[in-house]
Structure formats: C-alpha cells, structure tokens
Amino acid sequence: MLRLGINLQNRLLVGLNGQSLLKRAVTRNAVAIRMNSTNAGKTASHEMTWPEFFKLRKKERVFNTASSVATAIVFVNGSWFYFSTLEIDPTQTIFGFDPLMAITAGMITCAAVGWLLGPIVGTALFKATSGPKLLQFQEKQLSFLAKIQKNRVNPQSQSFSNPVPDYYGEKINSIPQYRQWLRDCHSYKRKASEFL
C-alpha cells in the first residue's frame, strides 16, 4: 500500500524537466542519511606528527641495533660450534696462517656478517610491531629525507676547521636537533663561502 502511494505521488509530482521531484528528494535524503550513518566525515585520519615520527624513528634504530647485536652473537656462536668440532693439525697452516689465527679471523668475519644482517631482521621486526602507523611513518620518512636532501651542504668545501654537519641526518632525533642541524648547515655554507 505504501509503495502504491509513492508511485501515485510520483506520477503527480513530475517536474518541468521530466524528472520526479520525489525521486530527487528521496535520493537527497538517502545520501544524507547514509553519510550520517557512517563515521567517515566525523573522524579524520590522524596524521602523524613530527615528534611521533622521531619517536618511531628512534624505536626503529633501537630495533636495528639490538638485532645487530643478537645476530652477531648468534653467528659467533654458530661459528664457534663449527670450529670447535673441526679436527685441526697444528703443524699445518690454513690459507698460509696459523690455525688459531685463521679460526679467530673466521669468527670475527662471522660476527661482522651477523652485525651487517642485523638491520634486516630489525627492520622486519619494526614493521611487524608498528602496525597501522607504518604507512604514515614511511610517508613522513620520505618527507624528512627530502628535507634533509634539500638542505644538506656540499661536502667538497670541508676542512678540519669546517667539518660537514651530519650529511645524512642520521643523528637527528627531535625537532630542536633538526633546527640545530639547519643552523650548522647554514654556518658551514657561510664559512665555506667566506674562506674560498
């Protein structure tokens, strides 16, 4: 019965352009109701601030350093396990070196390889634990690196009295440190232009 009433009213309310006024009204109200029923307009996505970015950046560095230490220890222990089971003739040389020296060099090499593979593990752990903030962090990271690249100095003018200030911006962990880095870059440029 309700449908019949709408159809009857629909036939009566035909506008000048041939489109039903009721259809337009229902469509407008349906869209408004749909928009009010969702939270899309009410909650804007929280954009990551610079202090949050620097906090996550520091967390990533801690993850990378800790995983480098852990993988270096694992690799040294693995090499120790391997070398301790070898039968070595003390009268023979290994690659022209004393066996004890060769084994020590092998263990140091394994520790170095473990240390270098650590950031791969650390980055994977950081990505797994950072969750929904990861995309915003990566966008901020690109923005930050673009700012660093734009403002960094030309290292060709360096000297003992005028060293290059943190070329890659690795030591910047806060906004005040970034501002200090900018001041150091401007000071470097000024000194380089005055003394050349």
Curated annotation (Swiss-Prot):
It is a multi-pass membrane protein. It holds the Pfam family Pam17. It comes from Kluyveromyces lactis (strain ATCC 8585 / CBS 2359 / DSM 70799 / NBRC 1267 / NRRL Y-1140 / WM37). It comes from the Eukaryota. GO terms for cellular component: PAM complex, Tim23 associated import motor. InterPro entries: Pam17. Component of the PAM complex, at least composed of mtHsp70 (SSC1), MGE1, TIM44, PAM16, PAM17 and PAM18. Residues 1-33 form a transit peptide. Signal peptide: none annotated. PANTHER family: PRESEQUENCE TRANSLOCATED-ASSOCIATED MOTOR SUBUNIT PAM17, MITOCHONDRIAL. It is found in: Mitochondrion inner membrane. This is Presequence translocated-associated motor subunit PAM17, mitochondrial. Component of the PAM complex, a complex required for the translocation of transit peptide-containing proteins from the inner membrane into the mitochondrial matrix in an ATP-dependent manner. Its main location: mitochondrion. Belongs to the PAM17 family. The chain crosses the membrane at residues 68-88, 106-126. The lineage of its organism: Eukaryota, Fungi, Dikarya, Ascomycota, Saccharomycotina. Keywords: Membrane, Mitochondrion, Mitochondrion inner membrane, Protein transport, Transit peptide, Translocation, Transmembrane, Transmembrane helix, Transport. One of its GO terms (biological process) is protein import into mitochondrial matrix.
